[in-house]
Curated annotation (Swiss-Prot):
UniProt protein name: 6,7-dimethyl-8-ribityllumazine synthase
Residues at the active site: H89
Binding residue positions for (2S)-2-hydroxy-3-oxobutyl phosphate: A86, T87, R128
Gene Ontology terms for molecular function: 6,7-dimethyl-8-ribityllumazine synthase activity
Entry EC no(s): 2.5.1.78
Top-tier EC class: transferase
Organism, as annotated: Pelotomaculum thermopropionicum (strain DSM 13744 / JCM 10971 / SI)
Involved pathway(s): Cofactor biosynthesis; riboflavin biosynthesis; riboflavin from 2-hydroxy-3-oxobutyl phosphate and 5-amino-6-(D-ribitylamino)uracil: step 1/2
Amino acid sequence: MPKLYEGHLIGQGLRFGIVIGRFNEFITNKLLSGALDALNRHGVADQDIEVAWVPGAFEIPMVARKMASAMKYDAVICLGAVIRGATPHFDYVAGEVAKGVARIGLESGVPTIFGVITADSIEQAIERAGAKAGNKGWDAAVTAIEMANLMKILK
């Protein structure tokens, strides 16, 4: 039988950094609420959570890299909302943010979680921020807890 590794969902004693984009704040506030609720319900103390607001999604990777390189967080959670408009701006921003967040996790070894909603409409973003389709902030926080614990096991 192979040896299996899996991160558990107990957040007590873990530290988290959250980077959140202010653009589309009516959506990102809901993501932050979901993430904080998930962290607290899984045993993470408020004093073990630090939140950094950035102007928009494009700035998330820069601050996430700073947090990951500080090596004081067990995981960094990236939250934002990019909503498609009439120009190709959406494609550039969404793609670069996703690549940046992934690169930071790979280079730093600190789980860096992509909790950025990419939506075709405001309605779709609202659904993913706590209405019909769950809350992607909550999902990102639970993923961060699991990955932080898995990385501790694999050290």
